[in-house]
Regions:
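Conserved nucleotide-sensing/catalytic segment adjacent to the nucleotide-binding pocket
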Residues: 82-84, 91-138
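Post-Walker A helix-loop "phosphate-sensing" segment adjacent to the P-loop in P-loop NTPases
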Residues: 72-82
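Charged, amphipathic alpha-helical linker segments immediately N-terminal to NTP-binding catalytic cores
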Residues: 1-40
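Hydrophobic positions on the alpha1 helix immediately C-terminal to the Walker A/P-loop
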Residues: 66, 70
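Hydrophobic anchor at the beta1->P-loop junction of P-loop NTPases
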Residues: 53-55
Length: 178
């Protein structure tokens, strides 16, 4: 498994000066830096030959946005890429564990249908295609509709807060060895 890590630098005084003089320039600089990091990640993914890339992070950290940016960067480099959200593998509200105060624990790994995740990742690795569930967030249950996905020889970017749990990593290793 390759790991792509781009460490953050300490904030320099020049950056504070840019922010004070021109907030728009700071935003532009940040966007440019982000785009360079995404392009670097796309280059690493492409060179690795990986079929499946797992992207994780805390809630609301930009996983979905980053996954779609990475897919676009790979496509610009000539590698087909599609994004799969682990959110679509939620079992449904009736299966969610509860927090001590009685509210549903949406971030508990047990909310995900792990056997179905494994099945879909294996199919993507072995055949390059699978059928994905669709989760209906307004109804808090899995939709009857499904989404077929065909990698067309490209890369699948799987994003979710539990994408790098030990079970998912084990599936990734099994898929890579085939």
């Amino acid at each position: 498994m390759i790991t792509i890590w781009v460490p953050k630098r300490l904030v320099e005084i020049d950056l504070y000066n840019v922010a004070a003089r021109s907030p728009q320039a700071l935003a532009d600089l940040s966007e440019q830096s982000y785009a360079q990091r995404v392009d670097y990640a796309a280059q690493k993914v492409q060179l690795s030959g990986a079929k499946i890339v797992m992207l994780t992070g805390p809630s609301a950290s930009g996983k979905t946005t980053s996954a779609h940016c990475l897919a676009k960067a790979l496509q610009k480099r000539g590698t087909p890429a599609q994004v799969v959200s682990l959110d679509n593998f939620f079992k449904g509200a009736e299966f969610y564990p509860r927090l001590p105060d009685g509210t549903l624990d949406y971030e508990n790994p047990d909310t995900l249908d792990l056997p179905l995740i494994k099945q879909c990742l294996r199919e993507l690795s072995e055949m390059g295609k699978t059928v994905l569930p669709i989760y209906d967030f307004s109804a808090e249950k899995r939709s009857a509709e499904v989404e077929p996905i065909d990698l067309q020889g490209g890369v699948c970017i799987v994003e979710g807060i539990h994408a790098l749990r030990s079970e998912e990593r084990r599936v990734g290793k099994e898929c890579r060895s085939r």
